[in-house]
Regions:
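A membrane-periplasm/extracellular boundary helix in multi-pass inner-membrane enzymes
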Residues: 127, 204, 224-269, 283-291, ...
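Transmembrane alpha-helices of multi-pass inner-membrane enzymes
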Residues: 37-43, 217-218, 344, 374-413
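Transmembrane signal-anchor hairpin modules in multi-pass inner-membrane enzymes, especially those
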Residues: 1-82, 102-112, 116, 175-188, ...
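Selective detector of the "anchor" transmembrane alpha-helix that sits immediately C-terminal
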Residues: 332-354
Length: 413
């Protein structure tokens, strides 16, 4: 039985970690507050119990080097307090990842709590998402704007439902296989939820989210061992459901396929990278890089420099960030920061090829199915050939780092 002190220092932060998938639906405030509180509770526990060995972690060491570079970069390229604050605050994501390891070890129920929070969160979003798509209002009866051909996230005004589902679905999949992999009837039942989620990602009208979900599904099907057939069948059922819905209503099809073909320029003589506007962001970022090759213009500074005439490439080329992680790192952190990202991606590919080689020729798997699902979430985060959100945005950073802690825990155990 945990005493009152342990309930506060262990159970409370464990609950906060498990509630993050639900908090992310509401926006950045509650999820970011939870991350900060988890970090504080973690540090209190570490210093009270003198468990400093948790910092003796290769991931944290590499993260710390990257963080120190960001901090020094923001001092050298100081524009206003915003970029300095962002670099200092970035440390919390590395600490949070280590904290997840700590609290899972101290409170094993954290895994089940997180799973059930995922079930509740996804059920809420599935119900609301399909109501928005077919009835044109949310679950509260408020009308939605159907002209955008996209679906909003519940409790949120942003069109990021597909992004949320596609990035966190692999984590939900991982926990399902870990906790209930031996319960065949349960896996079959939960597979229907998988199909509903994947279909909704398509209906959300978010092209990148649909691409990422398909990419992670292929990644998982190729690399997992025990649940390969289940994942393949659910993907086929999802595509079949999407096909049937598209016959009835081609709203999502227009957004996913027709608009993409038009923006890339496949129906004209001029080809674009993703779209004409995306291409203008990349060209502006590249010009900034050419003027600041080694350390870039400073984190979160794209928005401050893009309005300058020398960097304008299009009427809409100025925005908050260049909409691609690697392009943003190149422009804002220079070659040094960019090499961090590229090295991580190449190392990741190397490990996955080793896993595939062992699976094909030796029937030995470097990673288990739980880890592969988590790695698929990380894979779509570091995938270079797709538009992405602001790398230093709080909400997206939480989504990026959330699976990392669970993966690190699995390596340790």
């Amino acid at each position: 039985m945990l005493n009152f002190k342990e309930k506060i220092l262990i159970t409370l932060p464990s609950l906060l970690i498990s509630l993050i998938p639900l908090f992310l639906i509401t926006g950045p405030f509650l999820s970011d507050l939870s991350v900060v509180l988890v970090c504080i509770f973690f540090l209190i526990n570490i210093f009270l119990n003198k468990e400093y060995s948790f910092f003796n972690n290769k991931f944290f060491l590499i993260f710390l080097i990257f963080f120190l570079y960001l901090f020094i970069n923001s001092l050298i390229k100081f524009y206003d307090f915003n970029n300095l604050r962002s670099s200092i605050g970035y440390l919390r994501f590395g600490i949070f990842s280590i904290a997840v390891i700590y609290f899972i070890e101290k409170q094993q129920k954290l895994l089940k709590w997180t799973f059930f929070v995922f079930v509740i969160s996804f059920l809420l979003l599935v119900i609301d998402g399909y109501i928005q798509y077919f009835i044109k209002e949310n679950i509260f009866g408020n009308p939605v704007d159907i002209r955008s051909l996209r679906i909003r996230l519940l409790f949120n005004d942003q069109y990021i439902l597909g992004s949320y589902l596609s990035r966190l679905f692999p984590v939900f999949l991982a926990l399902t296989f870990l906790l209930y992999g031996n319960k065949k009837n349960y896996i079959i039942f939960i597979s229907f939820l998988f199909v509903l989620i994947e279909t909704l990602i398509f209906l959300s009208g978010e092209r990148v989210a649909f691409f990422f979900n398909t990419l992670s599904a292929i990644f998982i099907i190729i690399l997992i061992n025990k649940f390969k057939k289940i994942r393949f069948i659910t993907l086929l059922l999802s595509f079949f459901t999407i096909f049937l819905i598209s016959i009835y209503d081609d709203t999502a099809k227009k957004r996913i396929w027709d608009q993409t073909i038009n923006q890339i320029g496949l129906d004209s003589s001029k080809m674009n990278i993703f779209s004409e506007i995306h291409e203008s962001h990349y060209l502006s970022a590249y010009k900034m890089f050419l003027d600041n090759k080694v350390i870039g213009i400073g984190i979160r500074n794209f928005r401050n420099y893009c309005h300058e005439e020398r960097y304008k490439t299009h009427a809409d080329s100025c925005t908050t960030h260049p909409h691609n992680t690697y392009v943003q790192l190149l422009a804002e952190t220079g070659l040094i920061g960019f090499l961090f990202g590229v090295t991580l991606f190449l190392y990741f590919i190397f490990k996955m090829l080793n896993h595939l080689k062992g699976a094909l020729f030796k029937k030995q798997y470097l990673f288990n199915d739980f880890q592969i699902c988590l790695l698929s979430a990380i894979f779509i985060t570091i995938w270079p050939l797709a538009p992405s959100g602001n790398f230093f945005n709080n909400w997206i950073s939480i989504v990026y780092f959330f699976p990392v802690g669970f993966f690190l825990w699995s390596l340790k155990n």
